[in-house]
């Protein structure tokens, strides 16, 4: 299962958008999805501030095009489109951390699509304290590890400077008859 054929064949429309010039097919567990030629995409919709972490295209380009297509056409629900996206990222060999970051971002986008301001505020009231709650232990543990590393490095330097090297063994004395 996975994508059928080679990579996507696209033409640039402008600085952000591209158009498929050949169909892109994905064989799922039960269904086959085909993105038609002429479909307009921006590849991975990554905010500009995060492009250094996740570029707009890469090993996940076909998965991003498929996800754009499934969300725009409504062929499957948003949750299913996000699940297919995650599965296709796995099949494309995208690393686990990047795969989960990308999946979490599209899930968040799907959940916030059409959300009322009250819903977004409720989500922020949970998310912001959670980040702060997690940031404090991360900073403390990182600082402790840095102190430990510095102490260990100090002992290593002292040991390296004061080490004693044994005298080289004597050369063998060869006698011939």
Can you say where each PLM-predicted feature lies in the sequence?
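Extended terminal accessory/targeting regions
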Residues: 1-177
């Amino acid at each position: 299962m996975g994508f059928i054929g080679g990579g996507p064949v696209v033409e640039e429309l402008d600085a952000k958008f591209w158009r498929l010039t050949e169909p892109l097919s994905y064989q799922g567990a039960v269904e086959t999805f085909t993105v038609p030629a002429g479909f307009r995409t921006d590849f991975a919709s990554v905010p500009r501030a995060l492009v250094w972490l996740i570029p707009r295209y890469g090993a996940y380009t076909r998965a991003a095009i498929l996800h754009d297509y499934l969300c725009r056409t409504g062929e499957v629900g948003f949750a299913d489109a996000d699940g297919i996206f995650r599965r296709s990222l796995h099949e494309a060999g995208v690393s686990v951390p990047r795969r989960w970051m990308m999946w979490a971002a599209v899930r968040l986008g799907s959940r916030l699509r059409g959300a009322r301001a009250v819903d977004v505020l409720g989500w922020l009231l949970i998310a912001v304290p959670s980040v702060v709650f997690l940031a404090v232990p991360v900073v403390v543990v990182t600082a402790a590890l840095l102190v430990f590393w510095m102490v260990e490095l100090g002992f290593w330097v002292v040991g390296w400077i004061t080490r004693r090297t044994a005298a080289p063994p004597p050369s063998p004395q060869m006698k011939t008859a």
